[in-house]
Structure formats: structure tokens, C-alpha cells
Amino acid sequence: MALLNTPVLAAATAVSFGFYLAGLFVYRVFYHRLSHIPGPRLAAFTVYYQSYYDFFPHQGQFLWKLVELHKAYGPIIRIGPDEVHVNDARFYKEMYGSSVHKRNKSPIWYWMDGLGAVGDQSMFITLDHDHHRLRKAGLGTYFSKRKVQELEPRVKEKVLLLRQRLLERAGRGAINLKDAFGGMALDIITQYCFNQCMGALDRDDLGREWNQLMAAGVKINPFARTFPTVARTLLRLPKWVLGVSGMVSTTGEFLDLADRLSANARNEAIRDLQEGKYTLTDDADSRTVLHSMMRSDVLPEHEKGERRLQADGMTLIAAGFDTTSRTLTVVFYHLLAKPAMRARVLEEIRTLMPTPSSPLPTVAQLEQLPYLTCVIHEGTRLAHGVAGRLVRIAPEEDLVYHNSSDDTEYTIPRGATFGQSSYLVHTDESIYPNPHDFIPERYWSDDGKPTDAERYLVAFGKGTRMCSGINLAFAELYLTIAALLGAVDMKLAPGTTEHDVSLVAELFVGVLPESPGVRVNVVGSL
């Protein structure tokens, strides 16, 4: 009986646990299916290697640790017990698959799966390749280039409203462009998808509060990637409990916003369908993305439930807000900081918009302006879209990566998690010399032909999972640059520097510094 006293039990437990950890270390480092892939042994042993740089004490810094690891170990590295990271833009297309080569999303990264909230039933969070394909088909052509052109007046209306709001503030102090663009993007995505506008541009702060809310919401990601079960549990708690944690409560507030908008649009779609108001010949202005989904012949009825469609509503708002506003902020900083570049873009715009009061050209017309297009490409590159790695699983095939530098091959077995990061692709010096400089000319050769630089842009992803809203995003970029650059005289406020548009953390999306931001003083109309 004496052997069963507490100190002995504690010691026996500790020794047993130590043997377990030692055995686990030996297995994962030397005998695991990924043991042939180079990388730090500690990363192969535990996911908490990532957490040290991702969550605590260095929040959102693992992306830059990846840069160091690739320099030390080469283009393919093992960064977790069952995860591989590749830094090779030429292998990107193969990694992210096609309709024939299936790619599932990995639950290692998409911690929201199975939560019952935070969009876990959305198309974006859907892990299975075939299930995602079904849900994406339910959107129909709502984000196609033709549909975006059809609904372009909705976008133009908000772009011109932003221009009006900026001119109204002429001589009244500095304006934060990220807030202004965020308010416009929020109004556009809600009007475009739900035919209900958030009204951010009607507020005195141009929707700054909503900007801050959504920026705070992504702060949960490093914590949730480290402790997914804890994060899911917290988000299921009552709202009065969530209020204790600002990080979690802001996520809850964003969910409430998305739920209200998508629920209203879904109810309207149901009424219209019941009353026979919605047909294929309806005026485009009366349609919403929820109308398209509710009317879809592809989606089974259980895919049209309230929670399911609200989940897609949430992800549409989130996806249509941050990346567009961040890209516009990057573009306008560089245009305002570089007068010669600004003058060259304005010269092109003037061929379609001769005076500040001229009608705003169409997106189709603006797409024909080569230098403006190069500026937009460079803006998407340096804004990076989703800066963090997009992880996938190949469920039916092994991937073979050939390292051309030493003529070696590495097999990524089916079922293992792998990914690349847009930040590393976009800062690859072999593709983009001086990668941190804003150089639109890199997309055109001296003989006036496109270069390969555009081919490797991955701000919107690649493959079957690439961003559905790419056409809408480009429409916003073209129209906003033309509307503001062609009519508003503004200057960077003192103290605004390139640091204000440089990524300092990765919380799934790239994060700009906690500075006053890119601020401008509006002088008036040109």
C-alpha cells in the first residue's frame, strides 16, 4: 500500500509521461511519413513550435520565421508533425489542384469547422473538395465577370459616394484612407450581395467603428490555431460571458452583423419566391446572392437552411472588406508618395475621363489602360491578399516536388497537410526583383509585352478554391482609383510613411501596423 502513496504515483506518472514524449519524439522525427522532409526537429515533434511565433510571445510572426526556415533548409520544409510548407511559385498550381485533382482544406488551419457558428457551414470553411464544389455551384454566376458588369451601377454608386464624402471633408483635417476604403468596401459588398447597405459612408467616421471591429475579429486566429477546441468552446458561450474577452466578443459582434444582413436577405428571397416575384427575367437590381442560392437547382434543400446561408453571408462580408480596402490603401500611398507615377496614371485616366466632372468610365474601359492595370497588379502583390499559408490536403494522390537546385525529389503523401504563403510568393526575388519596392513597370517588358510577373500573383489564390469575388474586387479597384485620382486633389498628411502600408503580422490576413495609418489631407476638387 505504501507504494500507492501520492508522491510515488506522481513520480510514476511523470516517468511514464516522459517515456511517452520520448517515444513520440522518436516516432515523429525518425519514422513518421514526413520524416524525409527537412526542417527543425522541434517543429516535426510539436505544433507548439509554430505557436511560439504565432500566438505567444510573438503573435502573428510565424510567417517571417518561415522565411528564415526556407533560407536554412531549402524550398520544402516540414513545419509541423503532419504539415509541409513549400516556397516555390512554380509548384503553386500543382499544389492547389483543379477539378480533376482534388484538394481538401486542412482542419489544422480551418479551426472553425464543426463549430456551429463563425461560418463553419460556409463555402469558405467547407473542407471536402466535392462538398465545396457543390456549394460554390450554388452561387451560380453571381460573381462572374458578366454579372459584375451587370451590377456595376451598385459599385459605382458607392465609389462616387466616397468621392463626395472626401470632397466634403476638404480642409477639415486628415482622413484615414484605410477607414474610408473599408467603409466603401463594406457598403459595396453588403449592397451587392444583399441589396442592403450598411451605410458606413453615411457615418461621420466613414465606418471606422466597423473597420476596427473586423480588424479585432481576426486576432482570435493565432489563439484558435493553437487551441482550436478552447476557441470553439469560448465562441459557444453566452454573449455576456464573451464580453469578458475583447478578442472573442468582437468576433461575436461581427457574427451578429452578418446574421442580420443575411437573414433579412434570405427572408426577402423566400417571400419573393413564394409570391412568384423572382424569375430569370427579373431586373438585375432586384436580385441578391441569397436569391440566387435559394433559387438554385444545384443546391439540395438542406443546403438552403438559415444557418447555412448566414454562414456564407458572413464570409462574403469578411472576404469583400479587408483585402480590397488594404489593397487600395497600398496603391494610394504609393501614388501619392510618387508624383511621377501618379501623373502617369492620371494621364491614362484622362483619355477616358477628360475632366474631373466627366462620367466615371466603365470597368471594361479602365481595364484597357495598361499602366493603371500594372499599378493594380502591384497593389495586389504588396497587399498580399490572405498573407498566411493556405493549407490543403490531396486525398487521392501523392505530390512529388522536384528541387531543381540540388536535383532531389520529395514526396508529399496523400492525406498530409501542405501549403504555400502568398507573402513568400510575392516577395520571391527570382520573380520580383527588389520585391518590397512598388514597381508597376515589372509587369511590362521594354518591348511593350507582358512579363511573367502577373502569372505568379496569388493574392486571390489559385485552383478550384480561388476567391470567388475576384471580379468584384478588381471592379472596385479600377473604379475607385479612377474616381478619386481623376477628381480629388489630396496629399499625404505629415508623418505618413511606407511603414504604414507594410505588413507587420499575419493573422490569416496581413495586418498593417498600429499607427495613425495612411492619412491624407483633401485640398478639394482637381
From Swiss-Prot:
Its cofactor is heme. Keywords: Glycoprotein, Heme, Iron, Membrane, Metal-binding, Monooxygenase, Oxidoreductase, Transmembrane, Transmembrane helix. Pathway: Mycotoxin biosynthesis. Heme binds at residue 467. InterPro entries: Cyt_P450, Cyt_P450_E_grp-I, Cyt_P450_sf, Cytochrome_P450_monoxygenase. Pfam families: p450. One of its GO terms (molecular function) is monooxygenase activity. Belongs to the cytochrome P450 family. This is Cytochrome P450 monooxygenase ucsK. It comes from Acremonium sp.
